[in-house]
Amino acid sequence: MRASALQIPSIRIERGITDSIQSIIREVGFRQVVIVRGTPRDKVLTICRAIEECTEITSIIEVHHEPSLPVLETHLNALKTQNIDGMIAIGGGSVLDMAKALSGLIPAQKSITTYLEVVGLGQPLDNNPIPWIAVPTTAGTGSEVTKNAVIDIPDAQRKVSLRDPRLLPHVALIDPSLTDETPKHVTLACGLDAITQCIEPYLSKKRTPLTDALVEHVIPKGLKALTNLMTTETQSDRDTMALVSVTGGIALANSGLGVVHGFAGPLGSVTGAAHGEICAALLAHGLKAHRAYVTDPELVVRIRAIEGWLADALGGEPTDAFDTLDHWIKNQGISGVASLGLTKAQIPEVAIASQSSSSMKANPVDLDTDILIRILEEAL
């Protein structure tokens, strides 16, 4: 048996759990907090008002794009002089990543690049992060349970991670009601990101029995729930996708990812496309590459299981499942990576950059530059 361990925060998952935000804040002991939030929708504003009634809010930061180094530096300059004992993040993956990065870097003593992977030294944080509470409003990235924050570095055209086990939130509050009535295109992109983050750890060279037990349960359920949500809004399917998202976050944090996420960082930095849409456009092509190059008998069985789950959710024959998935995603409105802004001339650059990605290190097979280029060309 492979060695197994899980690093996870305290997780509370329940429809309506955010109605208890005040008691949770008192339990944690926050007195002066920064709120990091996305677009202030009614549900988000309701939570913010509840927070304001029980603690002092020193700043509110609104996040509308994936965190970038220049924006992060601006917020750090403003916050380092404030007396803060907690942070609360309410939003999607970009919001949670911004809060996570700020929680770690506000107490840090050195330059930001000291702690960044790939473009920096990748050193551990020299001080404990500010405790924070994660309240995701989308079911996608799983950032509420991961120990890294993804930061865009425009000058390097790379997205890299700030990574430290202490970046996990003090508690993650998973309230599926916050995702109700999410627009279809957001549901699709976030949902396929979440499913990818369950599938890639299932095939990862770092997979463990613990993460296997988690993702095997939710991949088939997630595929059916996401398919349903493209035509019908139901609370039960929203609840399922919230579970898929948090499960994918736990799995990737403990077993790694693979080729789809290996591409996602460089491709996103080059094109500016949303992370979930990139994962959606690449998932079927990444799976085809695994089927073509994986020889490990155990992984071959797992790939066949994925084909079966896809056929159950989407119809068709298991042997055609990856093509069926690709066609279904396109029919739902996410076309190839060319539609996201990638040109054929940029493909070699993205392929080469992806090879140094932390996500690619867990891919079940080593893929050389020529193969990576071919995958991207087929995904155009």
Residue ranges of each PLM-predicted region?
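Short, amphipathic C-terminal "tail helix"
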Residues: 344-380
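Flexible, glycine/charged-enriched surface loops at secondary-structure junctions
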Residues: 205-214, 229-240, 255-260, 297, ...
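Carboxylate- and glycine-rich phosphate/diphosphate-binding segment that chelates Mg2+/Mn2+
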Residues: 148-255
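ATP/NTP phosphate-donor binding region
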Residues: 1-86
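Glycine/threonine-rich beta-strand-loop-alpha-helix active-site module
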Residues: 70-177
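Gly/Pro-rich interdomain helix-loop hinge
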Residues: 270-346
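Glycine-rich phosphate/pyrophosphate-binding beta-alpha loops
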Residues: 140, 246-279, 357-361
